[in-house]
């Protein structure tokens, strides 16, 4: 269960007006729920027998197998812990109560035309679980995002070098508004911290965890970024293969000039030998014909063409 729960992302939810991060797993006959307000982390784990006992205790008028109770509970509880809008969880009314170190989420719905009550009675989570489910993955995510920023900075540097090469060979922008200054990574970092970051109004109790961060959390926590990070386009296997291919193309294009020159030189030698051999086996041509052959030979010579004419 721990591994399955680790693969799930934290989702921002609002229960009875309180903002929380939730992580919930519902199996065939058991569940486990984690909730946090970034001050405390609560959890509850229940199995079949415990679910049957609590369902009978909270719903005296209902008599049903444990599987029927659990199936209905899943249908009304999953939306509550998935961050959906209130209109989408109208099948159940949710209430939140905190007593000391305990947190209770109360749900009220209908089953077979009768009220169905359920309570998630969560207690504080051990520190080891908090580290496994929250602290370690978030630290790993910061490393991944830092590497992603470094890759983007390196890409911008290569783009600047490419633009400079175009400019040195006479390329001119058609629209002046598109012109940009060369990217300087240290200056950008300083400006981001001193100018942009204060405008973001980021607080330490922010519960923002959007879909992109959820996807990154799942990738990091499932071990997909162990030796080869797959969520950065520049470091993906396809991108690495393309980078190697591009490097080979650059190397091949760099050696094209000498190779063509050497090939033309060898061809000229071969042509010269062939002409000498033919002249020994045939009658001498007139001076006019010789002049025409020489002019034709000069016309057939190739002229080297570079990237810029």
Curated annotation (Swiss-Prot):
Domain of life: Eukaryota
C-terminal tail: annotated span: 223-298
Alphabetical keyword list: Chromosome, DNA damage, DNA repair, DNA-binding, Nucleus
Motif (XLM): 299-309
GO biological process, one term: immunoglobulin V(D)J recombination
Residue(s) at site: Leu-lock: 114
UniProt remark on domains: The coiled-coil region mediates homodimerization.
Presence of keyword ATP-binding: no
Bias type Basic residues, positions: 297-309
Pfam families: XLF (PF09302), XLF_CC (PF21928)
Protein name: Non-homologous end-joining factor 1
Bias kind Polar residues: ranges: 253-265, 273-290
Described function: DNA repair protein involved in DNA non-homologous end joining (NHEJ); it is required for double-strand break (DSB) repair and V(D)J recombination and is also involved in telomere maintenance. Plays a key role in NHEJ by promoting the ligation of various mismatched and non-cohesive ends. In some studies, has been shown to associate with xrcc4 to form alternating helical filaments that bridge DNA and act like a bandage, holding together the broken DNA until it is repaired.
Region of interest (Globular head), ranges: 1-134
Protein's organism: Danio rerio
Localization annotation: Nucleus; Chromosome
PANTHER family: NON-HOMOLOGOUS END-JOINING FACTOR 1
One MF annotation (Gene Ontology) recorded for this entry: DNA end binding
Family: Belongs to the XRCC4-XLF family. XLF subfamily.
């Amino acid at each position: 269960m721990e591994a399955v729960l680790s693969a799930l992302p934290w989702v921002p939810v609002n229960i009875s007006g309180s903002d929380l991060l939730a992580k919930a797993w519902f199996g065939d006959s058991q569940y486990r729920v984690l909730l946090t307000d970034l001050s405390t982390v609560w959890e509850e784990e229940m199995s079949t027998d415990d679910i049957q006992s609590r369902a009978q205790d909270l719903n005296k008028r209902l008599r049903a197998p444990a599987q029927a109770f659990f199936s209905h509970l899943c249908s009304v509880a999953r939306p509550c812990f998935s961050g959906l809008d209130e209109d989408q969880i109208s099948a159940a009314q949710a209430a939140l109560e905190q007593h000391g170190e305990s947190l209770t989420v109360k749900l009220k719905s209908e089953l077979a035309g009768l009220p169905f009550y359920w309570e998630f009675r969560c207690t504080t989570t051990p520190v080891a679980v908090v580290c496994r489910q929250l602290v370690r993955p978030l630290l790993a995510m910061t490393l991944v995002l830092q590497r992603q920023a470094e890759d983007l900075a390196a890409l911008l540097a290569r783009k600047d070098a490419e633009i400079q090469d175009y400019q040195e060979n006479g390329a001119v922008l058609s629209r002046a508004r598109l012109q940009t200054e060369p990217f300087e990574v240290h200056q950008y970092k300083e400006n981001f911290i001193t100018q942009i970051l204060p405008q973001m109004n980021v607080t330490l109790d922010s519960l923002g965890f959007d879909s992109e961060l959820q996807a990154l959390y799942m990738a990091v926590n499932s071990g997909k970024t162990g030796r080869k990070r797959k969520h950065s386009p520049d470091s993906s296997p396809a991108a690495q293969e393309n980078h190697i291919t591009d490097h080979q193309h650059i190397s091949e294009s760099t050696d094209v000039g000498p190779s063509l020159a050497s090939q033309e030189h060898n061809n000229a030698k071969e042509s010269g030998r062939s002409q000498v051999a033919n002249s020994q086996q045939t009658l001498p041509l007139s001076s006019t014909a010789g002049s025409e052959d020489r002019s034709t030979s000069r016309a057939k010579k190739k002229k080297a063409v570079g990237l810029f004419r």
